[in-house]
């Protein structure tokens, strides 16, 4: 009966008559019918919603009539009571009537019906969510199959693995737990930061497995890293590819810096690359959230070759510019095929920097003489050399970008966000600046890698050949 009335009502809606009168009259009639049915159902008449007979086990009765306590009601009775208490929203009624999206029930009818939106289902608690994921297989070591050993360090071993859930390859970073010390602080940092970073140019943390003996981080698997890529192409990259990798590096770093996160350990070994050419920041073990009150950090960060001079001289107060110096060093290395400042000690590293960029003075670097290490070493007075003489394959824009990153005064270094808008990347087009955070640069058909001049026949080193990759992941 109710379905017939609904059809009649919908048919009246479709008539070509003045809209306001038709809506109000039809709704008035429907409202009255709806209220009657709703009241009759609440009076325990055996009539289900929209004219359907209710299931026998769901018949309604008072708890006191059955002699049961309210807390002892059967599931069927509890279900029916919940149904009696339900209120319908405007959206519910509109869906039942299949009204067009541009038609809304007038407010006065909603008030008359006292229709309130039903409570939305509450989100799962953290404990419930963990239990649900555990049922699927997440958080369990047996979900993953270890394949090849990729590397081993003081605290961790990295394996190539496979997920039984998805059949996808993964990287398993197994961190050994010492009962006296617990999980290393680097592992805690890496987990706490990566679980909140969702970007196409940042490695994805898929799962976390905690046992008595180990903490295993499950990452997406990428075939190679930038160091291995350079080795395989004979340290002679296409300048177009240099630009694409550089843009991806800056894109991922800008995302981190916008969230006040410093990577602090940028180097080619920590920039992973898959077969598609997607570059992703990895190894956040030394990363730091800068939102903490203090500005003092350890200066024992960043591999020596990519460490900025202010940190080499002992500065512990730094911000996002610490990463930008490393970006400049990596840019140079991709363009030339050799590291920019390959020093073996802090003093030698500073000597190489000063010999290329000129020995700093109070005029070129205010406050440099305040560093005791600078006064102690007594460096010769070098004059700056033109960068184009050392990186001749870079064009004018590339040299300008490089020089904007390799500045002594940290606050003067170009930021990652500003670097993305540099004219050096103009040839990539405008659409690369409009991508969503999780969208790959290669989702644009105009972005493709070119064959490198030093190409050796395979894009990446095959598993099992040469040294294990990602030695720097520790």
Swiss-Prot record:
Protein EC: 2.7.11.22
GO molecular-function term, one example from the UniProt record: cyclin-dependent protein serine/threonine kinase activity
N-terminal signal peptide: none
Start and end residues of each Protein kinase domain: 144-425
GO biological process terms on file: positive regulation of myelination; regulation of cell cycle phase transition
InterPro entries: CDK (IPR050108), Kinase-like_dom_sf (IPR011009), Prot_kinase_dom (IPR000719), Protein_kinase_ATP_BS (IPR017441), Ser/Thr_kinase_AS (IPR008271)
Gene3D superfamilies noted in UniProt: Phosphorylase Kinase, domain 1, Transferase(Phosphotransferase) domain 1
SUPFAM superfamilies referenced in this protein's UniProt entry, alphabetically: Protein kinase-like (PK-like)
Reactions performed catalytically: L-seryl-[protein] + ATP = O-phospho-L-seryl-[protein] + ADP + H(+); L-threonyl-[protein] + ATP = O-phospho-L-threonyl-[protein] + ADP + H(+)
Annotated PROSITE patterns: PROTEIN_KINASE_ATP, PROTEIN_KINASE_DOM, PROTEIN_KINASE_ST
Chain spans, region Disordered: 44-93
Modified residues (Phosphoserine): 14, 74, 89, 98, 117, 132, 440, 443
Enzyme type, top EC level: transferase
Positions with a binding annotation for ATP: 150-158, 173
Pfam families registered for this protein in UniProt: Pkinase (PF00069)
Function: May play a role in signal transduction cascades in terminally differentiated cells.
Protein name: Cyclin-dependent kinase 18
Organism: Homo sapiens (Human)
């Amino acid at each position: 009966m109710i379905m017939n009335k609904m059809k009649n009502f919908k048919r009246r809606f479709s008539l070509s008559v003045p809209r306001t009168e038709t809506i109000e009259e039809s709704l008035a009639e429907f409202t009255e019918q709806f209220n009657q049915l709703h009241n009759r159902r609440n009076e325990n008449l055996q009539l289900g919603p929209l004219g359907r007979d209710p299931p026998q086990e769901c018949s309604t009765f008072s708890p006191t009539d059955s002699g049961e306590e309210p807390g002892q009601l059967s599931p069927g009775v509890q279900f029916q009571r919940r149904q009696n208490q339900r209120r319908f929203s405007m959206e519910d009624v509109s869906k039942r009537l299949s009204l067009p999206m541009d038609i809304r029930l007038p407010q006065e009818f909603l008030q008359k019906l006292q229709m309130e939106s039903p409570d939305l289902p509450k989100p799962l608690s953290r404990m419930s969510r963990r239990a649900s994921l555990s049922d699927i297989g997440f958080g369990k070591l047996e979900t993953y199959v270890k394949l090849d050993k990729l590397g081993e360090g003081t605290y961790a071993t990295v394996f190539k693995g496979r997920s039984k859930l998805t059949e996808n390859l993964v990287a398993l970073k197994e961190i050994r737990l010492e009962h006296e010390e617990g999980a290393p602080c680097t592992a805690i940092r890496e987990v706490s930061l990566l679980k909140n970073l969702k970007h196409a140019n940042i490695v994805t943390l898929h799962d976390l497995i905690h046992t008595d003996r180990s903490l295993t981080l499950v990452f997406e698997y990428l075939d190679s890293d930038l160091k291995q890529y350079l080795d395989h192409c004979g340290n002679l990259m296409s300048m177009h590819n240099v630009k694409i990798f550089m843009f991806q590096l800056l894109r991922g770093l800008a995302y981190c810096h916008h969230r006040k996160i410093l990577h602090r350990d940028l180097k080619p070994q920590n920039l992973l690359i898959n077969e598609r050419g997607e570059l992703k920041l990895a190894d956040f073990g030394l990363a730091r959230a800068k939102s903490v009150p203090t500005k003092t950090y350890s200066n024992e960060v960043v591999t020596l070759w990519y460490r900025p001079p202010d940190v080499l001289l002992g500065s512990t107060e730094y911000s996002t510019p610490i990463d930008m110096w490393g970006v400049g060093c990596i840019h140079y290395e991709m363009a030339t095929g050799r590291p920019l400042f390959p020093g073996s000690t802090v003093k030698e590293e500073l000597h190489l920097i000063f010999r290329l960029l000129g020995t700093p003075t109070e005029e070129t670097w205010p406050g440099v003489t305040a560093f005791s290490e600078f006064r102690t070493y007594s460096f010769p007075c070098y004059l700056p050399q033109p960068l184009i003489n050392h990186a001749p394959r870079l064009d004018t824009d590339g040299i300008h970008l490089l020089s904007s990153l390799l500045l002594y005064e940290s606050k003067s270094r170009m930021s990652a966000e500003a670097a993305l808008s540099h004219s050096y990347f103009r040839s990539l087009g405008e659409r690369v600046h409009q991508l969503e955070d999780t969208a790959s640069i290669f989702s644009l058909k105009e972005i493709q890698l070119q064959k490198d001049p030093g190409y050796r026949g395979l894009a990446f080193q095959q598993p099992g050949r040469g040294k294990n990759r990602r030695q720097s992941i520790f």
